[in-house]
Amino acid sequence: LSVHLWTPDYFSFRTTRDQALRFVNGQFVTIGLEVEGRPRMRAYSIASANYEEHLEFFSIKVPNGPLTSLLQHLKPGDKLLVSKKPTGTLVLRDLKPGKRLFLFATGTGLAPFMSLIHDPETYERFEKVILIHGVRWTNELAYHDYIEQDLKEHEYLGDEIRDKLIYYPTVTR
């Protein structure tokens, strides 16, 4: 279990993945923590790809939020509850065919798209994948360096990503 603070408000966190958990890239699960003996659960899109051994989530801290204010301070050894039933229709099989796939996200809405841009099928089905990520401030462009640099060097998808993924980080202030 680890937490990455992108800004004081934006953070991502990773946890080990139960090998029995199967999901389709773009889906979400319900996650949470036990608080005062009861589970406190919320739906979160999965940011990691379905072939990775960990689960990654991207969140914003909601002031006095019943769950996000706790998730931001997770430490190794803390127990994160993860539902066994992923769901959601933001998946490739539900998209109409076409030459270009446009992915528009603001803030933490980037999470399911992170999963999709790691999916080999995305690049098989579309000639171009255009990812637009809008935020208020430059420092809120979480994953920017990863998308611009590291992802293009992906061991298996690097060539496809360099050729087909177009990334437009957008800042409004």
Where are these regions (language model features)?
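Ferredoxin-reductase
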Residues: 1-78
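FNR/FR-type flavoprotein reductase catalytic core
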Residues: 66-173
